[in-house]
């Protein structure tokens, strides 16, 4: 597989994939939009505090690598960015809506169980049941042009195995286990986080609308 992203590059791409689906009226994103998305406190793990300069450097690098492209003109006063990471006209990586939702959530939050993924990815794709989540993960793990995700060894005392994306290279399972946050009620926490993300998205839309009306 030809993808070797840094953690920050994965965050930038994940944000663009997310916003393309959840807030299409604000997509493509400006540099400021990408900064805000990267530093969101909801649906992000770990929470980052990237500067505009740091994000601009990542954007420039990803454009050179053909994972993003710039969009300007047609009345746009600022340069905006859209992803070419997957499902682009000339790109090789083609993903279904379900696969995009899972890959995006893994890029933004790291290793997660199928249950966590189903809840957290629900704003991008409504999975009918857990079987659909698991079959989509297995498809991503066994693709001939992949694999793009890997199933991690089940941790002691946990009911579900976690999955991790492979777009940043091979996974250090020991490191993931030692850094994994403890969660006594993962399903409830995931639902709360999903609701918090929806509120954040709605606030962002309202701010954008008010700014537009004030112009």
UniProtKB/Swiss-Prot annotation:
A Pfam family this chain is assigned to: DUF480
Highest rank taxon of the organism: Bacteria
Family assignment from sequence similarity: Belongs to the UPF0502 family.
Family annotation (HAMAP family): UPF0502 (MF_01584)
Protein name listed in UniProt: UPF0502 protein YceH
Species whose genome carries this gene: Salmonella paratyphi C (strain RKS4594)
């Amino acid at each position: 597989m030809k993808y070797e992203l840094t953690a920050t590059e994965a965050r930038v791409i994940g944000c663009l994939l997310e916003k393309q689906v959840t807030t299409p009226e604000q997509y493509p994103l400006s540099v400021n939009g990408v900064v805000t998305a990267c530093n969101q406190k909801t649906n992000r793990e770990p929470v980052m505090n990237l500067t505009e300069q740091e994000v601009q450097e990542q954007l420039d690098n990803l454009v050179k690598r053909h994972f993003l492209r710039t969009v300007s003109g047609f009345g746009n006063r600022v340069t905006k960015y859209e992803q070419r990471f997957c499902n682009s006209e000339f790109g090789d990586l083609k993903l279904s809506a379900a696969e995009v939702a899972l890959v995006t959530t893994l890029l933004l939050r790291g290793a997660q169980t199928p249950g966590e993924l189903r809840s957290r990815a629900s704003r991008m794709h409504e999975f009918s049941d857990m079987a659909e989540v698991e079959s989509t993960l297995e498809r991503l793990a066994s693709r001939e042009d992949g694999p793009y995700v890997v199933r991690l060894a089940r941790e002691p005392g946990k009911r579900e195995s976690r999955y991790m994306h492979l777009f940043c290279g091979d996974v250090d399972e020991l490191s993931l286990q030692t850094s994994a946050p403890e969660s006594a009620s993962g399903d409830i926490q995931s639902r709360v986080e999903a609701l918090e993300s929806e509120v954040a998205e709605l606030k962002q839309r309202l701010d954008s609308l008010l700014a537009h009306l004030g112009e």
